[in-house]
Amino acid sequence: MTIKESYNVAGSPTTWGDPVLKANVTDCSALSVERLEKAGVVLFGKTNVPLMLADYQSYNAVYGTARNPWNIDLTPGGSSGGSAAALAAGMTGIDAGSDIGSSIRNPAHYCGVFGLKPTWGVISPKGHALPNVVAYGDISVIGPLTRGA
């Protein structure tokens, strides 16, 4: 499976689309990543995000622009737009995104895939935060995107 770029994956850069964080290679994985890998999941890629996960599209100066695979002139949405685009293009079957203000739901809608914003706290956000940030967002949730419900 793939995972949104903003999740910590040991040995992989986690930039949140910010060029200042381009060299931020984490040495430990997010709790959700650890649980997925313990269950046998193989992560084979991270998907694009807008700068600081704060836009309705998925462009950043680190990785460029994610495009909607149904029409490359259109956005796949944001902030989990890279996730939804990868699913719609058939590059992956499942992706882990995050959502505060429709960051899973809008990209899923734009790309014709399924996205779920679960109840807050169902999945731990540990490891899905900017470097050196101790507190977690009190409204951010971790959730899945898939090709279908």
What annotation goes with each model-predicted range?
Residues 1-101:
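Gly/Ser-rich catalytic/binding loops embedded in alpha/beta enzyme cores
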